[in-house]
């Protein structure tokens, strides 16, 4: 066979072998692409799961916030009214002691939030003033629980926006739109109706409850005035860190003077009821966790969401307290509380729109 004929035979063989290699290249490239795809899919799945994790985290925070807030309220009522532990000032001092210790551990050791330092004597005096007002509001609220059912206590407490608007106008001359003030009318009207329909109404308890509500509103307005400058502003956890020890020091002499037999009665109750000290400890820890979770919920949600959650929390506390303590309620009382809550919702909405 000639060399020319051999060349003709070799050409198709070479072309055939070249054609066979092409599919191999395409298969290997497809394999590489397939190897990359699982990573891309995992990235997409992780990015899609992160919003779910965030939602789960916020939902858990809200549930814990509700549990701690409502839990400390119901435990306060149980201890002060049903358990024979009639020492609201000492109970408040226990709460403040727990807040002082746990705030220090959370901020200094666990570093849950950055530590902010008091920079001047003037700033310290401002924080001390806020601490005294805060003490008065908590003590007043605890005293009122001795005489009033939780449901009515919450109805009166819902009038906080009314007192906040009042003190803001008196102390800072800050005016809201007239429609905003108009929304406060049902807030007050509802409490008046609820008071008339409350079977367990007690004048001293009512005065202490309304005073505690006013003090709470006064403290929020005063805080905005005293710690208004950027250099003196503290977040709520650092403010609690500095306010709590001052509150304990202020409450100690008041407890000794107004509740002199607190230690003997507490020791007696501790011998009679084996869970007495555990209840006091859990109650005090819950008081701190309510503040911590309130800070975290505020940080991770919007102001509007927080307002809605706060209103719903009051309603949930009322329902649970009625089921637990079985205090009698009337249609008039429920109607009055409902009007108050609707007024608070309307006030928040008008304030947001006419800001």
Swiss-Prot record:
Pfam families: TPT. Residues 22-32 have a biased composition (Polar residues). It is a multi-pass membrane protein. It comes from the Eukaryota. GO terms for cellular component: membrane. The keyword Transmembrane helix applies. Residues 19-51 are annotated as: Disordered. Its main location: membrane. It is found in: Membrane. The chain crosses the membrane at residues 55-75, 89-109, 124-144, 150-170, 177-197, 198-218, 239-259, 277-297, 305-325, 328-348. Keywords: Membrane, Sugar transport, Transmembrane, Transmembrane helix, Transport. The keyword NAD does not apply. Belongs to the TPT transporter family. TPT (TC 2.A.7.9) subfamily. This is Probable sugar phosphate/phosphate translocator At3g10290. The lineage of its organism: Eukaryota, Viridiplantae, Streptophyta, Embryophyta, Tracheophyta.
């Amino acid at each position: 066979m000639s060399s020319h004929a051999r060349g003709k035979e070799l050409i198709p063989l070479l072309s055939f072998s070249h054609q066979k290699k092409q599919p191999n290249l395409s298969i290997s490239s497809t394999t590489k692409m397939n190897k990359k795809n699982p990573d891309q899919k995992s990235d997409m799945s992780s990015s899609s799961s992160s919003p779910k994790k965030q939602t789960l985290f916020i939902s858990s925070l809200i549930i814990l916030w509700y549990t701690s807030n409502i839990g400390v309220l119901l435990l306060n009522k149980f201890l002060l009214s049903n358990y024979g532990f009639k020492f609201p000032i000492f109970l408040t001092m226990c709460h403040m002691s727990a807040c002082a210790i746990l705030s220090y551990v959370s901020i200094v050791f666990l570093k849950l939030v950055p530590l902010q330092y008091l920079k001047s004597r003037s700033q310290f005096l401002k924080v001390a003033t806020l601490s005294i007002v805060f003490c008065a509001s908590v003590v007043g609220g605890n005293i009122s629980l001795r005489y009033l059912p939780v449901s009515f206590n919450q109805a009166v407490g819902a009038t906080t926006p009314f007192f906040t608007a009042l003190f803001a106008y008196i102390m800072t001359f800050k005016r809201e739109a007239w429609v905003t003030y108009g929304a406060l009318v049902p807030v007050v009207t509802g409490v008046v109706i609820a008071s008339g329909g409350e079977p367990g109404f007690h004048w001293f308890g009512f005065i202490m409850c309304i005073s505690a509500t006013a003090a709470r509103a006064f403290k929020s307005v005063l805080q905005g005035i005293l710690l208004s400058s950027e250099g003196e502003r503290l977040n709520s956890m650092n403010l609690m860190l500095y306010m709590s020890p001052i509150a304990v020091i202020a409450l100690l002499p008041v407890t000794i003077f107004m509740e002199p037999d607190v230690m003997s009665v507490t020791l007696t109750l501790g011998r009679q009821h084996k869970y007495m000290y555990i209840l006091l400890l859990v109650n005090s820890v819950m008081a701190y966790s309510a503040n911590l979770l309130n800070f975290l919920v505020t940080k991770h949600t919007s102001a509007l969401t927080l307002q809605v959650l706060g209103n719903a929390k009051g309603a949930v506390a009322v329902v649970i307290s009625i089921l637990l303590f079985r205090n009698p309620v009337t249609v008039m009382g429920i109607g009055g509380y409902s009007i108050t809550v609707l007024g608070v919702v309307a006030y928040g909405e008008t304030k947001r729109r006419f800001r």
